[in-house]
Amino acid sequence: MANIMDYMDWRGDLSFEADEFNEVDNLILAQLAYVDFEGIVTAEENAPAVPLKEASGQFWEKNDKDEILARVSMTKSAPFVMEKMAETKRFSDVKLRCYVNEIRDEEQFQFSAVCVELPDDGLYVAFRGTDNTITGWREDFNMGYLSETPGQLRAVEYLNRAVTDKKQRVRVGGHSKGGNFAVYASVKCDPQIQNQILNVYSNDGPGFRSDMVESTEYQRMLPKLHTILPESSIVGMLLEHQESFEVVKSSNSGIQQHDA
């Protein structure tokens, strides 16, 4: 069954001008949030964006492929997705900026995100899902009973700060908990930015408590919210959803379907 690497073989030679942005592009860009850009892409929102080719080259100068492959992680493929992206016409000209990666054990807080400047002058804001830290998993559990988590609040702050061009078209997305953050940030961000947002993508991300999905602000953004789920989704079926969703086939089974 074809995957995102096959998609880049198939459509990687087409620019966004030739073939407009689609849901698979969203999933590919969401993977960039799992790459460690520490020392490569600065957190400063007004700093020059870093070309993907350059960021990929610097990453692989600092990291060993065999060591990454040996990790016990569902997200270890992300750097290889980035490497493939840098080789394609479709993604090689994207630029990265505003990378943050924060973990605060005492607050049970794990947050990471990166902005992707697209060749069509659009912006994709990618939020990272749960990492391998205990803190990250604790925050996941907190979502079940807290009306808002520190990570969700940080996502709102990040989105408000990262969108510096008030005329730019914006897409927001993430995988797993990153999808939840993408939706939460889009629902709670400044009205000006909400007007700029074209679509919000939750790639197998959990939903929210009923008070959130029934709120006026959530309902206002509902037409722009899109959830993408594998056939036997587990994470994406947690808590409540009201947005439209699309089910995709997966060659994996059980929780392994959560792997993008």
Positions of the model-derived regions?
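Short glycine-enriched nucleophile-adjacent loop
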Residues: A182-P191
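Gly/Ala-rich beta-loop-alpha elbow adjacent to hydrolase catalytic centers
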Residues: G173-G178, A182
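Alpha/beta hydrolase fold serine-hydrolase catalytic domain that processes acyl esters and thioesters
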Residues: M1-V24, L29-V114, P119-L123, F127-N142, ...
